[in-house]
């Protein structure tokens, strides 16, 4: 049995990237869908500046993902559209120990 690393990604958006974020979003979602299909996506979502006003923009995103190694995660991040297109200013990577929900 391979033990996967569970990793929390806190991704911070650059200011003024809402339009670009929305344009690139389908590519970003496609990659997350692939991780989900492979059973390696624990959770993912955007962090809106105002949950009632989509035009307010985003602070960034949170993703909790599973990879075999840190190197595999780094390779995956190299192709992340939000990073490649300059939407994310940076990504903080930290280990994550899932406690709940069980299963």
Where do the protein language model's features map onto the residues?
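Conserved, structured core segments of small domains
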Residues: 1-103
């Amino acid at each position: 049995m391979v033990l996967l690393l569970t990793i929390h990604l806190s991704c911070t958006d650059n200011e003024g990237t809402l339009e670009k974020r929305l344009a690139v979003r389908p590519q970003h979602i496609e990659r997350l869908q692939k991780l989900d299909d492979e059973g390696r996506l624990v959770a993912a979502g955007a962090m809106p500046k105002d949950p009632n006003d989509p035009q307010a923009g985003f602070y960034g995103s949170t993703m909790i993902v599973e990879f075999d190694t840190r190197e595999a995660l780094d390779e995956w991040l190299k192709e992340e559209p939000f990073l490649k297109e300059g939407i994310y200013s940076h990504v903080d990577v930290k280990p994550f120990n899932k406690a709940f929900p069980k299963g």
